[in-house]
Amino acid sequence: MHLSSRANAPAPHKPYNPFYLQLYFWVIIAIILGALLGHCYPVVGQQLKPLGDAFIKLVKMIISPVIFLTIVTGIASVAHVGTVARVFGKAMVYFLFFSTLALLLGLVVAHVVHPGVGMNINPADLHQGEIASYVEKSHDLTLVGFLMDIIPKTLLSPFVGDNILQVLFVAVLFGIALALAGERGKPVLNLLDALTLPVFKLVQMLMKMAPIGAFGAIAFTIGKYGVDSLVNLGWLVGSFYLTSLLFVLVILGAVSWFSGFSILKLIRYLKSELLLVLGTSSSEAALPSLMEKMVQAGCKKSVVGLVVPTGYSFNLDGTNIYMTLAALFIAQATNTELTPAHQLALFLVAMLSSKGAAGVSGAGFITLAATLTVVPEVPIAGMALILGVDRFMSECRSLTNFIGNAVATLVVSRWENALNHEQLKIALDGSEPAYQSLHAKDAEPSVSR
């Protein structure tokens, strides 16, 4: 009788919060006000850049502890090294497949839409001074250099830098070592597990400053580049936005449907984070919040800790679409004939160079420069054509990358039987709060067959 009454007891309901008290509402207001200020008073808008930069720096300050604590406690609690390798392998298969689809989609759309045809630009007439710094940075993006850079100089150096993969590398090794230590490692695991609570309280505190950061960042973008630059290259920008939307709704929508959840409900669930990414033009700004929300949606902490940080370097769907679409736009605008062999070379180089792109604003432009440097058939001077609108495309790149990593985390969790489907439904429907958090122990998932 006691069990029956408990089973029939109504579930606790989330207290109603008016929309004007929720974070996403104030981020929207901040973006609108920032855009208006940047348009009406461009000089003032440009001077507000430190607000956006300061918020990004505050978030990046907490990213390393979040990743380290999540991965170490997740792996050490699993206590099976083979599980870690299996999750990582499944994630890399997913990343490779959908990154390839994104690159192919960019190529196909460029051939169908022809965004650069008819511009008849002579590369010799383009001013290359503004892109020189991007080209110089792109020379450092080599495969060997990228792999070697994953290994930090010391055990502590990843925590004073901004290389997510170095933090991931150290965290995985430390988590495995802690798991192998057995009972003697329990005190350390308990300490790290306890530390996650104040760290994520700090994340919640920083997220309350998101409207200020979004306001400053969007005011700077509109003030510096203006909306006029969008008119001149509107066909390219529009093609990129529509292609990214197609990728999210059709391709990611299909894999979401097959995995048992709705892409539209997922987007609604992550609306605050997506608005933050839109305002700051950086998917990295919402990384800590994404990790916590994926656990709240029913993913095991150990899977989230491995998939999300790795995806920020290896699963950049928006950047991949941008690279092939922008490269063919430059070729079309400069009347450069690309044979199928040239396009295959471009595709293969883009597959490699995109894996080192960071989750910060402007990284996609540097990656494009690295790709065109290796494929000389496309004049790198043509990058000057899109420099003025790259910031506007950067926002779409970041949004697509962010959604892609959220979907990847849910899909890999499902493959691993590490997804609580009841908790996912509650989170995506928004009917009740998801009580589990990153500082909670992993619960047994409820997996639908």
UniProtKB/Swiss-Prot annotation:
Q: Which Gene3D superfamilies match?
A: Sodium:dicarboxylate symporter
Check the record and name the InterPro entries matching this protein: C4_dicarb_transport (IPR023954), Na-dicarboxylate_symporter (IPR001991), Na-dicarboxylate_symporter_CS (IPR018107), Na:dicarbo_symporter_sf (IPR036458)
Q: Which PROSITE patterns would you find in this protein's record?
A: NA_DICARBOXYL_SYMP_1, NA_DICARBOXYL_SYMP_2
Instruction: Keyword check for Transmembrane, yes or no.
Output: yes
Q: Which UniProt keywords apply?
A: Cell inner membrane, Cell membrane, Membrane, Symport, Transmembrane, Transmembrane helix, Transport
Instruction: Give compartment(s).
Output: Cell inner membrane
Q: Which Pfam families match?
A: SDF
Q: Tell me the NCBIfam families matching this sequence.
A: PRK01663.1
* HAMAP family in the record: C4_dicarb_transport
Give the protein family. Answer: Belongs to the dicarboxylate/amino acid:cation symporter (DAACS) (TC 2.A.23) family.
Specify the protein name: C4-dicarboxylate transport protein
Its source organism is Xylella fastidiosa (strain 9a5c)
Instruction: Give the lineage.
Output: Bacteria, Pseudomonadati, Pseudomonadota, Gammaproteobacteria, Lysobacterales
